[in-house]
């Protein structure tokens, strides 16, 4: 076997992305954000506090108490959630997971939908100005 070809193939890790249409690169500094969570417990881990950090969208997301209550249950299964603007859209995604753990709960889908709603409304406000 050649030194340049590793003995393994592609790793079976996947990441779920949700995309909001629009040119996010124009407002990149305002739209980039991620969650930071504080957990307690080892065996029965739970999220005790969380906050969004990043651009101005983080302030809007921090102000939504309904989203915060959804995130306290979802962040344990999804890991940190990030918002990343690109030229063709704004990506919303969680951590990498092994392919056998790719399961989307109803609460996770509601959470991503709520985040996408905030991003979409904020992006429309920015483009109207």
Question: Model-predicted segments: where are they?
Answer:
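Charged, low-complexity intrinsically disordered regions
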Residues: 7-13, 21-129
